[in-house]
Amino acid sequence: MLNPINKTIELGDGRTITIETGKLAKQADGAVTVRMNNTVLLATVCAAKDANPGVDFMPLQVEYKEKYSAFGRFPGGFTKREGKASDYEILTSRLVDRALRPLFPDNYHAEVYVNIILFSADGEDLPDALAGLAASAALAVSDIPFNGPISEVRVARTDGKYIVNPTSAELEKADIDIMVAATIDNIMMVEGEMNEVQESEMLEAIKVAHEAIKVQCKAQLELSEACGKLVKREYCHEVNDDELRKDVHDKCYAKAYAVATSGSGKHERSEAFEKIVEEYKAQFSEEELTDEKLEMIGRYYHDVEKEAMRRAILDEGKRLDGRKTTEIRPIWIETDCLPGPHGSAIFTRGETQSLSTVTLGTKSDEKMIDDVLNHGYERFLLHYNFPPFSTGEAKATRGVGRREIGHGNLAHRALKRMIPDNYPYVVRVISDILESNGSSSMATVCAGTLALRDAGVPMKKPVSGIAMGLISENKGTNYAILSDILGDEDHLGDMDFKVTGTKDGITATQMDIKVDGLSYEILENALAQAKEGRMHILGKILEAQPEAREDLKPHAPRIETMIIGKEFIGAVIGPGGKIIQGIQEKTGATVSIDEVDGVGKIEISGTNKATIDAAVKAIKAIVAVPEIGEVYEGKISSIMPYGAFVEFMPGKDGLLHISEIDWKRLETVEQAGLKEGDTVSVKLVDIDPKTGKFKLSRKVLLPKPEGYEERPPRPERGERGPRQDRGDRGPRQDRGDRGPRREYRD
């Protein structure tokens, strides 16, 4: 018998979120459905009963999946079935993972699988803002050890107003779009994009999010209590030896502290740390060094390294590479470093290096997006690659991983608002990380800015980025904020806070917190210190490349855009695409046309200006309106005894009367040397107001012969007197069958 339990959360604006358990997926360790209007997600959690041997980390796997049926759609492709995860699904999975992972106990190593499935959607309420709540609620109603609950919300600012979990329509107009995850007491994760906002405005958005999250966390606690899941399962995944722990600390700490304050480079420092632990192990015999003991020594020595690094910073202000807490590593930059790409740059900061390239494309290069809720075309792409050799690892290069997609997305969001809305090119930025020792995604932002400017992309403003760190103790009462963190400072520290922006404000951010007790004061100070670092790096970028390249590189495609009336779209395309295909074949240019906002938007691209100009001329001829007094190049389509019909514009014929061919009198058109198919210059001299027929003249374009006398104009009938009697000519003879009268073509 079903006995579902549910809780309702009020958002404060009339909307509600309902969490329910006990109805679906009851064999999972925990399962809930979360509903907001017509958006419904199911979240389940399952954990192994014990940890696998040798595992000393948290093997958490979060999978967010969307069903096309949720929105009443069929999947694409031959199989008509959901396939591998989309970028949106991967990014949503990462948002949930980053919020949950720090809250599992440090000594809990059993495999945990979190599955979140979108079963219903209406396109208005976005499911990624509900996924974190669903996952945490599923853990709350399970017996899996978890120091939650948490929740995630999206906050947008539209017309100066902060909105929690905005609709898709509200989000389109927002200048702030951030996702925030938190417990009742602490912020855990922030990620989002902004339109050059100030640090105080971003901080206010985080505060608004946290207030909403507190309500959602309390609802989860009530749900957990109603389910009777307040007691968590027992586990023992680590064997400990307090005497060994003390011995490792006593014999290794001083040596580790000396290395931590030596200011040595990454590999030298790594070798020195490794030498210390190897020397410690050497005091034991092979029989004594069991696998269990080796695992404990490694774990205890890791704690020693961490303590040494943190104490050196907190007590002496000395960082691993010898820098001060606010100091940025040395930067060197090279632009236009590769001849083939349309733009290129190398950005190196300390031991982190990005080689970024830019490719400019046309409309045909747009990326088609066909997710469940998101479908359309993307014109600005950024791809981030992190090969193993960048950290000196000897292993095979696999496909694109979740981390690469996440880092690339952050850099993409940092730069995309700085590309002009009306920029005609499709742009692809590729960042290949060639060296890495922290802040590689921020190096991507800086290298991407440089490569875009080298390609001649007229960015609104250049963007720089920096990664900030934190070392704190005693609930944040004693702390040090670190600018431009190293990989080890990220790993052993309490915060990874990435901030990107222009001289006028923040464009994107990503923050992960690993400790309790991060105050808003620390966040405010971190943002202020980050701004100083960003401005320093931006100065280096502007020194290397003060302005964007004025013109594209010679081998970059050229694009020209035309706007035509909606009524001309069919004429340009032609029956079955005949006209537009003919233009492309004749000129060598690529032509695409779309109806946008009630007009026809034509994009013409080619490898050189001549091909584009030829295509533009052909299109203008199709859409042009004939004007009296204009001169046209036409083709004689047919010859008659009284003149010639000339196609002077596509689909438009006019009469070139025999008297308008030349200044001298002609008996036949052929006397002027004209024949069908000839090209002739004509001037449009008149348009019949009743019939719309066109009257052309060739002779007005020819020099008037010397001594030529104009024939006097024919007098009006009144001056010529009455018509004379026809006399004895009798009635008009039968004219016979002369056939149909020739019609003018217009």
Curated annotation (Swiss-Prot):
Annotated GO MF terms: 3'-5'-RNA exonuclease activity; magnesium ion binding; polyribonucleotide nucleotidyltransferase activity; RNA binding
Pfam families: KH_1, PNPase, RNase_PH, RNase_PH_C, S1
EC top class, as a word: transferase
Key word DNA damage present: no
CC annotations in GO: cytosol
Domain spans labelled KH: 557-619
GO biological process, one term: mRNA catabolic process
Residues annotated for Mg(2+) binding in this entry: D490, D496
Disordered: region residues: 701-746
Enzyme Commission numbers on file: 2.7.7.8
Swiss-Prot/TrEMBL catalytic activity: RNA(n+1) + phosphate = RNA(n) + a ribonucleoside 5'-diphosphate
Alphabetized UniProt keyword annotations: Cytoplasm, Magnesium, Metal-binding, Nucleotidyltransferase, RNA-binding, Transferase
Compartmental location: Cytoplasm
Family the entry assigns: Belongs to the polyribonucleotide nucleotidyltransferase family.
Protein name from the UniProt record: Polyribonucleotide nucleotidyltransferase
Gene that specifies this protein: pnp
